[in-house]
Amino acid sequence: MEGFRKIEWAERYMKVLGKIREQFRKERPLEGFTVGMALHVEAKTAVLVRTLVDAGAEVAITGCNPMSTQDDVADALRESGIACYAKRGMDVEEYYEALRNVIRAEPDIVIDDGADLIFLLHGEMESYAEKVKGASEETTTGVIRLRAMEREGVLKFPVIAVNDAYTKYLFDNRYGTGQSAIDGVIRATNLLMAGKIVVVAGYGWCGRGIAMRARGMGASVVVTEVDEIRALEAVMDGFRVMRMEDAAKIGDIFITATGNRDIIREEHIRLMKDGAILANAGHFNVEIDIPALERMAKAKREARKYVTEYDLGDKRVYLLAEGRLVNLVAADGHPVEVMDMSFANQALAAKYIAENWQKLERKVYRLPEELDRMVARMKLESMGVEIDQLTEEQVRYLSDWRCGT
């Protein structure tokens, strides 16, 4: 079965998670715990699910995006006895009903991506929140929502911001998104990147990864930003930086990666050249103003799989993957080796919650640094890389304020 083959391929290259899985089989740290998950249901995620099951957990899972599930992987999970409610192409009601089904499993620990599951536990399904010992959140967008909830004092349980771990955002967000977003654009369009003007909206870790990889493929990259420091970084990194109003006039391919809404609006679309391509690498489909495109269009059609052509009368523009995550809808998401670290963090976060939930407050926490650094060490070991250690004299030097000129 294709789904099982995909999972086995991912397992082969997820060596850090594999080591943790071996440890979990012996220790069974999640024995007696139910884990409710909303993640992109594809092969790498399935390896995490298997790891949690080997740790003793009961698992219920659904997708965190209506379009990102790979049905053959979801089928493989169900065939393995996992309560999996995900399917590709859900409408909004089906999507939320699947989330409700996960919550009805009465999870002790929640693993979320985008915070939709956690949000439901603070709304219509809040009666189930009492049983939740803690949660972890995978992505920047979700952490932004959760920190807002913490500020307002409404969080009902502690949350570990796995996204904020160094071994997550420095690698997953930058190298993972950088490669997979470009992969999604290329798979959807079959067009050449070299010589194109690629406009990257946002210069956070995701945006800088996309900009880096687009330049590496020969594109001329323009960055748009609202943050002065990030804009200055982009300039110093050698990219052109300008307002979206100006970039709209020259761009061939636009990729949004901001975690905010209305980045590409009607006034920008009107300025674009014929054949402009719009793609989104942010979690939700709100970065490109799709309702504006629908209003402006005289006609629309499917030009290719994952490519919608909008005829605006004087020109055509192309929207990829319905404005959803282009890397997961039109491609396979992040590279396996990158998700090895991200999901190692998730597995360790679940264990940490199981062992420490009684000590944690209703706050958003970073993953403990010792776990973060352990993942880095394990990754280096899996790659055959050795590094130096500080000598005793060096340790003393770094801690002694008396040492000077």
From Swiss-Prot:
EC number in record: 3.13.2.1
> Which Gene Ontology MF annotations are present?
adenosylhomocysteinase activity
Q: Where in the cell is it found?
A: Cytoplasm
The pathway that the record names for this protein is: Amino-acid biosynthesis; L-homocysteine biosynthesis; L-homocysteine from S-adenosyl-L-homocysteine: step 1/1
What does the UniProt record say this protein does? May play a key role in the regulation of the intracellular concentration of adenosylhomocysteine.
Primary enzyme class = hydrolase
Query: Would you tell me the protein name for this molecule?
Result: Adenosylhomocysteinase
Q: Tell me what organism the protein belongs to.
A: Archaeoglobus fulgidus (strain ATCC 49558 / DSM 4304 / JCM 9628 / NBRC 100126 / VC-16)
Reactions performed catalytically: S-adenosyl-L-homocysteine + H2O = L-homocysteine + adenosine
One Pfam family it belongs to: AdoHcyase
Q: Does the keyword Lipid biosynthesis apply?
A: no
Annotated residues for binding of NAD(+) = 139-141, 173, 202-207, 225, 260, 281-283, 327
Q: Which NCBIfam families match?
A: ahcY (TIGR00936), PRK05476.2-3 (NF004005)
The text of the family note is: Belongs to the adenosylhomocysteinase family.
Tell me, what is an example of a GO biological process annotation in this record? one-carbon metabolic process
Cross-referenced CDD domains = SAHH
Residues annotated as binding substrate are: D113, E138, K168, D172
Major place of residence: cytoplasm
Q: How is the cofactor bound here?
A: Binds 1 NAD(+) per subunit.
The chain's disulfide connectivity reads none
